[in-house]
């Protein structure tokens, strides 16, 4: 690794190497030379005749490990760019409520883009469901759709499109790519698919479990339309669903092209080897972080008087952690329930945040973690539990509980402040931002999405152009964060005026119980919902 400012004119840098400078980084691959000409331009030239890079080898090269870290993440980022550019809905196109990732041929997460954490840590189970239910029936050109919360989904509006990637002979699956997008409406009792009083999954919309939308390249359009229009509460705007599904297919196709390009350049053996090295590196980073943690437990009270209970124990010899949720409340009779995939996503996110280096979120992060979750509890709900608030509220509450047990940061707003509104013609979904918790030597941040969500606020001009609504105020709610030596971040005030009748749903938390502080000075005031 070289600093460009340290290089002399005509000094040769033999690849593989990295040359860093204030405004960028240059990677010199094996078989290339880099040098500065008399004008200090960096000139790259081939040092040897081009050979197939399939001979790159399978042992770990630290430079190539970093290259592949970024290659894998970049593929997911390119998928996300395609999805944002081609989607129809404001929810996906503007709010960026989607995630893209690539997986190995067993369904293990390899890499993701920095999209929505609650999506990314839960998608592996969706891939494994497709593999399990379609054994010997997956072919080139197939595309699968799934939103079933109990088979790797989160809640019904989050629809996952999964595409296998085959080798050049079309015989062996080398990877899977997947995109998960929050559709503005997937049916249900209320517009936007967020009924506050749902007790059964059927009341929340259309459930899609392992549907093959493309069969060997043939689009089964009539069949998917039939599914979207089925059930007690069908989708309200199927054309919008179809447009966003098409965008997700396009995103996956981008991933396939990028993966095949990488395989063409480096060879499948090298790509698969570094895929494993990337996961091994993530595992080692998590193990190194674990030895610096302290054991702890936390009882996290919810607004309904129930508790999420968690105990974290550390084995510093094995460098492993056990996360035990024994004692957590049983399944909620309404919709504050999360499937196991969401619980896994939260744990993966929390432990990934403990790593200072820029590693991709992947399956390796799970290997040092032993997870104990009571069966049929509110964080391990089974069919036919209602789960619309699980992906949003329960994930945030569980995340705060884990940070409480670790004692490393104060509680965030711990809610996504889901604000869902619409009618038979239009539907929209928002998560309203808030404040992050303070740390041992820093203040929290005001007016941001926290933890398990990572979406954007819709641009006011686009919001008012696409919907019959006027945004009257969007401001920071000053001094609303918890007070202490280091203060929690402030929340926001958001006022909308509807220009025609709408049904409004809110799914929120911490209206009675305040987020916790560390060292317990002052907690934040409770949020307020709707003024009339």
Which residue ranges define each predicted feature?
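C-terminal, non-catalytic interaction/recognition modules in large multi-subunit enzymes and RNPs
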Residues: 1-524, 528, 532
């Amino acid at each position: 690794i070289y600093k460009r400012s340290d290089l002399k004119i005509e000094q040769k840098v033999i690849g593989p190497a990295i040359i860093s400078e204030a405004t960028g980084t240059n990677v010199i691959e094996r078989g290339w030379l880099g040098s500065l000409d008399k004008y200090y331009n960096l000139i790259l030239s081939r040092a040897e005749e081009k050979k197939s890079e399939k001979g790159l080898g399978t042992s770990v090269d630290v430079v190539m490990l970093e290259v592949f870290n970024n290659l894998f993440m970049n593929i997911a980022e390119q998928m996300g760019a395609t999805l944002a550019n081609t989607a129809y809905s404001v929810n996906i196109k503007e709010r960026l409520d989607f995630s893209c990732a690539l997986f190995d041929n067993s369904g293990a997460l390899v890499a993701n883009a920095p999209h929505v954490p609650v999506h990314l840590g839960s998608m592996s189970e969706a891939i494994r469901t497709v593999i399990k239910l379609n054994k010997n029936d997956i072919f080139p050109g197939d595309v699968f759709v799934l939103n079933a919360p109990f088979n790797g989904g989160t809640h019904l509006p989050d629809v996952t499109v999964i595409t296998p990637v085959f080798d050049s002979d079309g015989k062996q699956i080398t990877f899977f790519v997947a995109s998960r997008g929050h559709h503005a409406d997937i049916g249900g009792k209320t517009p936007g698919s967020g009924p506050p009083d749902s007790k059964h999954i059927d009341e929340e919309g259309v459930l899609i479990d392992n549907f093959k939308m493309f069969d060997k390249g043939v689009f089964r359009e009539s069949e998917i339309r039939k599914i979207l229009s089925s059930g007690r509460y069908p989708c309200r705007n199927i054309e919008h669903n179809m447009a966003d599904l098409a965008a997700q297919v396009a995103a996956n196709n981008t991933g396939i092209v990028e993966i095949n390009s990488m395989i063409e350049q480096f060879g499948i053996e090298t790509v698969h080897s570094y895929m494993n090295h990337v996961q091994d590196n993530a595992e080692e980073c998590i193990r190194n972080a674990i030895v610096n943690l302290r054991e702890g437990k936390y009882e996290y009270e919810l607004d309904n008087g129930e508790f999420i209970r968690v105990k974290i124990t550390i084995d510093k010899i094995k460098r492993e952690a056990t996360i035990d949720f024994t004692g957590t409340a049983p399944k909620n009779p309404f919709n504050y329930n999360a499937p196991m995939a969401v619980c896994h996503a939260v744990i993966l996110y929390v432990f990934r945040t403990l790593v200072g280096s820029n590693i991709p979120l992947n399956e390796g992060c799970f290997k040092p973690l032993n997870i104990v979750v009571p069966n049929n509890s509110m964080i391990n709900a089974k069919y036919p539990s209602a789960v619309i608030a699980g992906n949003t509220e329960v994930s945030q509450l569980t995340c705060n509980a884990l940070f409480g047990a670790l004692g490393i940061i104060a509680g965030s707003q711990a809610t996504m402040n889901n604000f869902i509104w619409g009618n038979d013609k239009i539907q929209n979904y928002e998560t309203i931002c808030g404040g992050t918790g303070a740390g041992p030597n820093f203040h929290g941040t005001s007016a941001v999405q926290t933890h398990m969500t990572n979406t954007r606020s819709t641009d006011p001009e686009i919001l008012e152009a696409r919907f019959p609504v006027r945004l009257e105020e969007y401001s920071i709610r000053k001094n609303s964060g918890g007070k202490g030596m280091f203060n929690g971040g402030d929340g926001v005030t958001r006022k909308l005026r509807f220009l025609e009748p709408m049904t409004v749903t809110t799914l929120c938390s911490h209206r009675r119980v305040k987020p916790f502080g560390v060292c317990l000075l002052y907690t934040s005031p409770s949020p307020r919902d709707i003024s009339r």
